């Protein structure tokens, strides 16, 4: 390789105008030497020194232009490198973010595919909780005891019985409205009236009208249940009454049952009178004893 080939192209550009201008100046100087004495126009010719002096600034301008061209050529290369260095990391970060987003979306998609009913359990539990809460706070579902429910029921207003006389009214109305109807329809109306009467004859359940009656029922039940002592006394009295009845003659045993039922109250009255007389006698005896004691103390 030659030495000229290794040189930078910008340096060749800078030296090219200088060599051309030097050649022109030498040619002009040679012309002046040849024709300096020949004609009157020799004074108008520019000396070689002046041409060289002019060529100096021209060479300086050429060097400056070459440096500017080299700078302009170098600046795009450096700027492009810096821009590439700045753009490179930004693009890499964006690509990483996109890859991360894609991975997250893929995970979500996989989760939804693997567990499609993940949120149904929470919804079902919330629904069951709300239903149980409503059932717990609903007063119409509470079950009370029998006696409490009977006491809590208030007096019912007397409901008018619409089934007292509607069959006759229906018969009169229907027969009056269907006077022009054929005989077969009249028989059907009579059968319907009979069925309505049978439905009306069904007894209705008795409903207590007052709370007082409802409260008396437990008291009556308690009164019916007598204590064992009273039951034993009643048995003794019955046995005592049965013994004299057994000692009576057989003629009285043949008495009709009506007479026996009539004589039993009389016997009970006599026994009560005897018991009262005995009590009075005992009281009189006690009074006599007290009087005797007082008299003895007074003496």
Swiss-Prot record:
**Where do Low complexity bias regions lie?**
20-31, 46-60
Q: Where is this region: Disordered?
A: 1-102, 215-299
Q: State the InterPro entries in the record.
A: CT47
Q: Name one Pfam family in it.
A: CT47
Record bears the keyword Lipid metabolism: no
Q: Which domain of life is it from?
A: Eukaryota
Alphabetically list the UniProt keywords.
Coiled coil
List, as start-end ranges, the regions of compositional bias called Basic and acidic residues.
1-10, 215-238, 282-293
Q: Does the keyword Transmembrane apply?
A: no
The cross-references to PANTHER family, in alphabetical order and at most eight, read: CANCER_TESTIS ANTIGEN FAMILY 47 MEMBER B1 (PTHR32157:SF5), GENE 6268-RELATED (PTHR32157)
Q: Which family does it belong to?
A: Belongs to the CT47 family.
The protein here is known as Cancer/testis antigen family 47 member B1
Ranked from the top, the taxonomy reads:
Eukaryota, Metazoa, Chordata, Craniata, Vertebrata
Q: Which gene encodes it?
A: CT47B1
């Amino acid at each position: 390789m030659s030495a000229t080939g290794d040189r930078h192209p910008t340096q060749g550009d800078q030296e090219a105008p200088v060599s051309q201008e030097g050649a022109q100046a030498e040619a002009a100087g040679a012309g002046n030497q040849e024709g300096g004495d020949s004609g009157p126009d020799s004074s108008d010719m520019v000396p070689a020194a002046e041409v060289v002096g002019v060529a100096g600034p021209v060479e300086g301008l050429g060097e400056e232009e070459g440096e500017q061209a080299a700078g302009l050529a170098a600046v795009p290369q450096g700027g492009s490198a810096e821009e590439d260095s700045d753009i490179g990391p930004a693009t890499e970060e964006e690509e990483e973010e996109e890859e991360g987003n894609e991975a997250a979306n893929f995970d979500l998609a996989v989760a939804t595919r693997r567990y499609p009913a993940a949120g149904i359990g929470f919804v079902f539990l919330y629904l069951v909780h709300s239903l149980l809460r409503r059932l717990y706070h609903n007063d119409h579902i509470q079950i009370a005891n029998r006696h409490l429910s009977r006491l809590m029921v208030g007096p019912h207003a007397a409901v008018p019985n619409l089934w007292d006389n509607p069959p006759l009214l229906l018969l009169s109305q229907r027969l009056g409205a269907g006077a022009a109807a054929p005989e077969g329809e009249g028989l059907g109306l009579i059968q319907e009236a009979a069925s309505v009467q049978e439905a009306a004859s069904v007894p209705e359940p008795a409903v207590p009208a007052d709370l007082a009656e409802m409260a008396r029922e437990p008291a009556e039940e308690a009164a019916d249940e007598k204590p064992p002592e009273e039951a034993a006394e009643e048995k003794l009295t019955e046995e005592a009454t049965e013994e004299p009845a057994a000692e009576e003659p057989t003629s009285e045993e043949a008495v009709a049952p009506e007479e026996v039922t009539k004589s039993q109250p009389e016997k009970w009255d006599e026994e009560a009178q005897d018991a009262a007389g005995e009590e009075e006698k005992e009281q009189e005896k006690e009074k006599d004893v007290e009087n005797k004691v007082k008299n003895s103390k007074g003496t």
